């Protein structure tokens, strides 16, 4: 019964996309490199992922400027995107933002410019 339902849903929905995943070193909780995240996702039948690493001030290393942090953050995405292009898996940039106003995490999907990211880190917790 369950396997029939899974098969039916798989036929109806052409896309299987992971909407929230982390990689290392951009996210401290990430267990895999960007390339490993992409390859593992493809091996499990995903057609795409949204790389939503943690985007918060506490991730900034001592002495690192906001711009340097953003560049380091984006590096994981660029690495994942290159691997995705190589093996045919769509990689979308996202982020998991925690703002100062509360301790909620917000998932943001889609592209963001480097300049916007630098401005956003100022609002991050």
Where are these regions (language model features)?
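A metal-dependent hydrolase metal-coordination microenvironment
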Residues: 2-125
């Amino acid at each position: 019964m369950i396997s029939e339902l899974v098969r039916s849903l798989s036929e109806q929905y052409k896309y299987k996309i992971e909407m929230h995943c982390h990689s290392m070193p951009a996210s401290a909780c990430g267990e895999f490199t960007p390339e490993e995240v992409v390859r593992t996702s493809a091996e499990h039948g995903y057609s795409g992922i949204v790389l939503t690493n943690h985007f918060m001030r506490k991730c900034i290393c001592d002495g690192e400027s906001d711009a340097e942090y953003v560049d380091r953050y984006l590096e994981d995405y660029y690495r994942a995107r290159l691997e995705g292009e190589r093996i045919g898996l769509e990689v979308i940039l996202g982020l998991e933002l925690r703002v100062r106003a509360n301790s909620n995490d917000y998932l943001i999907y889609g592209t963001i410019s480097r300049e916007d990211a630098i401005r956003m880190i100022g609002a991050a917790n």
